[in-house]
Each structure stands twice: as structure tokens, then as C-alpha cells.
Amino acid sequence: MASLSLAPVNIFKAGADEERAETARLTSFIGAIAIGDLVKSTLGPKGMDKILLSSGRDASLMVTNDGATILKNIGVDNPAAKVLVDMSRVQDDEVGDGTTSVTVLAAELLREAESLIAKKIHPQTIIAGWREATKAAREALLSSAVDHGSDEVKFRQDLMNIAGTTLSSKLLTHHKDHFTKLAVEAVLRLKGSGNLEAIHIIKKLGGSLADSYLDEGFLLDKKIGVNQPKRIENAKILIANTGMDTDKIKIFGSRVRVDSTAKVAEIEHAEKEKMKEKVERILKHGINCFINRQLIYNYPEQLFGAAGVMAIEHADFAGVERLALVTGGEIASTFDHPELVKLGSCKLIEEVMIGEDKLIHFSGVALGEACTIVLRGATQQILDEAERSLHDALCVLAQTVKDSRTVYGGGCSEMLMAHAVTQLANRTPGKEAVAMESYAKALRMLPTIIADNAGYDSADLVAQLRAAHSEGNTTAGLDMREGTIGDMAILGITESFQVKRQVLLSAAEAAEVILRVDNIIKAAPRKRVPDHHPC
């Protein structure tokens, strides 16, 4: 009996698209590797910057070497590339640094996987080998971690080293010592809480980056109203988000017909009376400072001035939220029950000058650890990149305060993990050993890229570094100032254990997810249905 051959049947809707097996895998690999190649030139202390230009009505220019910022601002269509972009964003949210490293490591793992699949090694065999390699690498990283949490002097030095290492690959590298000190002082003021909301960063054009400073207290980028006190001691602050243009019902497009101008004056008088009534309800709280998220308008401002109350209007939402946190108050919107409203407090409110701008300074706030870092710089792009760099350093330091374990940087940790994985591969029979070797090779690519970006002979340096670790020199790493192999413990090139651990685990998981893909199915685009019932 002749066998029937079934013709392939398309089960998808018209317009849907499917990529299978090798085609799907190749699409994923190409997209992920392209993302890694895009950001790898920014890796390390001598990494390059990217200029990001956006078009359209809100056209802007951004100069950065922050991996998460670059990936966040580029549009990607490849699904595997989107996985790496999301992973980089999570790395930024979780620990604040290592966004470029995690993307490059995942891309290098997939580059190795591509060559293994070309040798007919099954993806599941590769994944099994990678999982064992990840376990060995994590154990090697854990065993190399140093904890100085119980020694205050050594721990502070660790924080200085970590901040210096983080900032060395950023725009702030030329003012590294200055900003390292600022970041460490700001984080130590938090007293272990790790609440970065208490650290406010203000950017002001003018001067140079070296003119940036840490201010103990809170700065609000607003001006005090006309004819109001410019300085208040022992302030009681009511923070509000309320409309001061009376509580009238606004009827848009309505008209009022009157037979004389006296009637118009009566309407204005009635509105003023409602405003006055609201101001009186606010004053019953026994305050001497009123800060509103919305506009206050001239007449209520006059009333506050006559009562000797400082009134600040149109404070931005983030500023109001942070001010409520640091002064210990709550944001109110109704004022009928003064006993239920929690007021903020501080020892002194005064107007200060920074450059050519006036700001309001709150000192002696209820949240003692609150502080403001004022950034100065020649252009807005420099200030924006300085803020991103400083934010990364603050995030890493906050993580280190929670988990005080540290590891060595300069490619030392990657080489240490690669050495442990290679030793495991030598003891493992079968094809899984080949997958482990590829994992170790991907780890060794990170110091290779760091050396390449600095313009040194990466093959020679990485070979020397590998030999040093094979001989048991577990603190050897790349000294990019001299272009040689150095002792990371002596040079003080230290990184947070949590950052390195997160880079390792996230990259391995993302690479595994992409490697498992054997089909990419794109849904049919939605068709616009014509409107048969026009208005």
C-alpha cells in the first residue's frame, strides 16, 4: 500500500509569520550578539561614549556610556535583543551598575553557543553544561568575597574603592576622588536604611564638575513668594496638593450676562471670599510655611504674606514627595480637620543662591540623613551624564551597605570564575565539558574587551592574567593605567559582590532563555475596521 505524503498545512491566520528551528535560532543569536557588540565598546575604564539623538518635536541629544541608558533609548525589533534590553533594565533597577557587563556576557555566551550548535551539539546539552558552570562560577565568586562589615575603617575604604571603580568608567573619572567622597558621605548618612529618596540631586548650569558639592539638608528649586518672609526658624510646614482658585465648579464655555460692572465686581468679590475662607482654614493648622504642588495665585499669596507665612507655589511633584519624606510631613488636599494633618518640620528655611539661581534651603530636617548633591557643569549633557554616573555609584554603595561583601575588579573575578569552570570541565566527561569550556571562554572575553577598549594588546594581557590565576595568584587583574597585570588588592580596584553575582546569574539565565527558542511566531497585524456609523 502506497504511503500518503501530507502537504504542509498553514494553521495561522493570514498575515501571521513563523520562523522555525535553525532560522529562528539564528535570528535570536544575531539580534542578541548585535546588542552586545553595540555596547561592548563602552566597557571598562577606557570605554567610549555614545551620542543618542532623538528626532521629532521633542528632539534631544544625549552623550552617555551607561549601558542601560543606551539600550533604553534605542528601538529594537528583534525579540532576543528585547530580552537583553529588559535584562539590562532589571540590572539597573536592582543594583544600579553592571548593565554593560551583563549584556556583553550574555551576548558572548550566545556567540559561543552558536559555534557549538554548528558542531552538532544539542542546545539541551549546552544548557546542562552551562548550569553546572554557573554553579561552579558562583561558588568561586563566593569563596573570593571579602567582608569588612564589622571593621568601620576598612569598610569605609571598601566603599571608597567601590565608588572609585564604578566612577572610573564614567564621565566623572577625571574628578573621581571628589565624587567618590561625595557619594560615600551621602550613603553613610543614610545609616544603613538604603533609602536613596533621601538623597536629592540638583543640576545647575555653570562652573565645572569640580564645583559640585554635598549640602546637608534639602534644596527645593523654587522661589519664595513676593512680600513674604525669606527666612523662618523652627518651621512648621504644611505640604499640600490643592487648587487655590476657589472650590468652584468650572463650567467650560459658559457665559455670564450682567447688566452692570457692579455685578462683575460682586462675582470677583464672591470668588475672593471663597479664597480667603480657604486660606483661613489653612492658617488654622498653626503653620508658618505653606508649600503647594499647584499655583497659589496673587490674592492668597497676599493673605499668607500678611499672616507672616512663607508660601511656595508650583513645587514639582517629585520635589513635594521627597520634601514630605525628609520633613516628616504628609501631603494634604483638604483642610477641614487640622488635627488629622501631619505637619513637616525643620530648624531653618532660607533662600540661597547657587550660580545665578535662587533656591530654598531646608536645614535641620526631621529625617537627619537627608542631603542634597548639587551638580555643576558647563552643558546640560554633562550634567545629565554626571547625574546618571552618580546615581549608579549611589545604588552600588547602597547595595554594599546592605551586603558588605566585596570582590576584586579589573577582570580578576571573571578570570577566577573562568579558572574554576575550566577545572570543572577537565573533570567532566562527555559533551557537557565542551559547553563548560565555552562558558569559561565567554567569561574571559570580559577582561579581553576591557583591554581592547583601552588600546592594549588584549591577547598578551589576558594570557598573562590566565597564567597568574593558574599559579594561584587570585588577586591578579588588569591595571589599565599602566597596561600591565597588577594586584587588585594593592590597587584598591574593588567591586560589590552583589553586582558581580547579579551579572553572572542574569546573563546565564537570559542566554539560556534565548538558546531554548526553536520557533518565533509573529501574530498577524490588526486590521483597521472601517467605521460604518460616522458621527
Swiss-Prot record:
| InterPro entries the UniProt entry points to | Chap_CCT_beta (IPR012716), Chaperone_TCP-1 (IPR017998), Chaperonin_TCP-1_CS (IPR002194), Cpn60/GroEL/TCP-1 (IPR002423), GroEL-like_apical_dom_sf (IPR027409), GROEL-like_equatorial_sf (IPR027413), TCP-1-like_intermed_sf (IPR027410), TCP-1_chaperonin (IPR053374)
The EC category is: hydrolase
- Cross-link type Glycyl lysine isopeptide (Lys-Gly) (interchain with G-Cter in SUMO2), placed at 248
Q: Which SUPFAM superfamilies match?
A: GroEL apical domain-like, GroEL equatorial domain-like, GroEL-intermediate domain like
Q: Which GO terms describe its molecular function?
A: ATP binding; ATP hydrolysis activity; ATP-dependent protein folding chaperone; protein folding chaperone; ubiquitin protein ligase binding; unfolded protein binding
Matching Pfam families, A to Z?
A: Cpn60_TCP1
Where found in the cell?
A: Cytoplasm
For this record, an example GO cellular component is: chaperonin-containing T-complex
**For the modification Phosphoserine, which residues carry it?**
3, 60, 260
Instruction: Check the record and name the PANTHER family matching this protein.
Output: CHAPERONIN
Any idea what job this protein has?
Answer: Component of the chaperonin-containing T-complex (TRiC), a molecular chaperone complex that assists the folding of actin, tubulin and other proteins upon ATP hydrolysis. The TRiC complex mediates the folding of WRAP53/TCAB1, thereby regulating telomere maintenance. As part of the TRiC complex may play a role in the assembly of BBSome, a complex involved in ciliogenesis regulating transports vesicles to the cilia.
Its recorded name reads T-complex protein 1 subunit beta
Q: Which gene encodes it?
A: CCT2
